[in-house]
Swiss-Prot record:
<protein>
    <recommendedName>
        <fullName>Tobamovirus multiplication protein 2B</fullName>
    </recommendedName>
</protein>
<dbReference type="GO" id="GO:0046786">
    <property type="term" value="P:viral replication complex formation and maintenance"/>
</dbReference>
<comment type="function">
    <text>Necessary for the efficient intracellular multiplication of tobamoviruses.</text>
</comment>
Length: 122
């Protein structure tokens, strides 16, 4: 079922890309972390742990942006990898043929050498 924000943007569940899903999850994680920090500030017992956390979540924005860029490139990387694997599978058939031809050549040459060594010299 689509959320209110998805409906307002005209996005149905089936139309969402992996990038949009991950972006939403990152946004939810940031909001959850901000809410947790707010609750921790209200609790005096968590002040020591709070001091260990980053002062500003926006300092992590570059990491989030880099993650988004990597996610944007993933479909192309997967497609390229798939093409290379497919090519490799087709090459495997050719490799078997070449291997068989080389084995036949080697066998023929060895047979010829044996016959030349066995033949009487006149």
């Amino acid at each position: 079922m689509a959320t209110a924000s998805e409906n307002s943007r005209g996005i149905s569940g089936g139309d969402r890309t992996a990038k949009a899903v991950v972006a939403d999850q990152i946004s939810q994680a940031v909001n959850s972390t901000a809410n947790l920090l707010h609750l921790m500030r209200q609790s005096s017992s968590s002040q020591a742990q709070l001091a260990k956390l980053p002062k500003n979540l926006l300092a992590k924005a570059s990491l989030t942006k880099a993650t988004g860029q990597a996610l944007a490139q993933l479909p192309q990387v997967i497609s390229s990898l798939d093409a290379h694997i497919e090519s490799g599978l087709h090459s495997g058939v050719h490799l078997n043929t070449v291997t068989q031809l080389l084995e036949n050549m080697e066998s023929t040459q060895l047979r010829a050498l044996r016959q030349s060594n066995i033949s009487p010299v006149v």
